[in-house]
UniProtKB/Swiss-Prot annotation:
GO biological process: DNA topological change
Residue sites binding Mg(2+) per the record: 202, 254
GO molecular function ontology, one term from the record: DNA binding
Residue ranges crossing the lipid bilayer per the database entry: none
SUPFAM superfamilies, per database record: DNA topoisomerase IV, alpha subunit
Catalysis: reaction(s): ATP-dependent breakage, passage and rejoining of double-stranded DNA
Class in the EC hierarchy, top level: isomerase
Protein name in UniProt: Type 2 DNA topoisomerase 6 subunit A
Top-level taxon: Archaea
InterPro entries tied to this protein: Spo11/TopoVI_A, Spo11/TopoVI_A_N, Spo11/TopoVI_A_sf, Topo_VI_alpha, TopoVI_A, TOPRIM_Topo6A/Spo11, WH-like_DNA-bd_sf
Encoding gene, per UniProt annotation: top6A
Active site: 108
Pfam families: TOP6A-Spo11_Toprim (PF21180), Topo_VI_alpha (PF20768), TP6A_N (PF04406)
Amino acid sequence: MKLKRQKPKEKFSYDPQKVLKKLEDLAWKILEEAKSGKNPYFDVPTRGLNNVYFDEESRLIRLGDRLSRRYFLNVAHARKFMQTLILMAYIKRLVSEGKHASLREAYYANKHTVPGTRENTFEDQSESDPIIEDLERMLGVLREEMHITADRRGYIYGDIVIKDGEDEFNASKLGTGGWAVPGTVEHIQFPEINVDYVLVVETAAMADRLIEEKYPKRENCLIVATQGQASRGVRRLIHRLHYEEGLPIIVFTDGDPYGWYIYSTIKRGSINLAYLSEKLATPDAKFVGMTMDDIKEYNLENVTEKLKGIPPDKKGGPTGDYKRLIEELNYPWFQDKEWQRQLKLALKWGVRIEQQALANKSLEFVAKEYLPEKIREGKLLP
């Protein structure tokens, strides 16, 4: 199986004016309702599992159409209503001035005592963060497009040229540490791409191993290290590399329920961010490993780890890894027969297999045999 760059499927162009217009349209609506003597309100798409579904056609986890209405003249709603307007004004200022703020900065910048009262606008960041998520769903824009960022996590390494503001550089010439993916990647451009595909790797240790073994150069790929669950910035970057630049996406995680869920969020989206699946998920992604089949295929029985928790057939079970496996067995997006088989084998054997277990063969085994062989022969899970 030869992986190669394909024709781009979409072209993204960040336009701050569109974000400003959506903010202003919503603000004008509230103002007109107040001026006409009506009770101003926001319609907020409802969060939670009961408003999430798996869309078979798009192959994405999506948010349903349930709404909750938040009124100004309602004692139960008034505080959140005020907080929403405060953050809308703050975001408008950020976007207009071309500045960015972290979630923490957004909280502190807008925390103050309401004049004439002893009431604070925000008591804790746990109040401001959900309002920003509400605005994402109400406006249909990413938090990052509103110039609100989170801590950066993850890095990339490979022969692509990145344009970040006034800076332009090749991600294979920044040392073995690569380029750290920022919290927002909306402004990033890719003037030159000289790789055939993207290999997304769960652990930094495995990504470092592949870089040391010259895998990106030899296999002509871009390494994306997620360093655990992929951040929004990393997921958005993967999405853009596939849809805008036509690069196939291959994911490589530990063979356990958490590694498989990392793959699931990259491919299908997540329950918590179902409203952003269309912009963050990449349903064409494929999974190379680790799998339960790898244990037998590569004689790794002696380097497996026991699943954590209590099995379903024991008193108090299932808990831990076992509980997570059963949840995944029941998710609509894990119903493919190959995935069902992998999950059931993990339950039956009661083991997990880490990426680093391949070092039992040799340090270079993963880069020179395991990955090239599986990708070349198309041994990939959907």
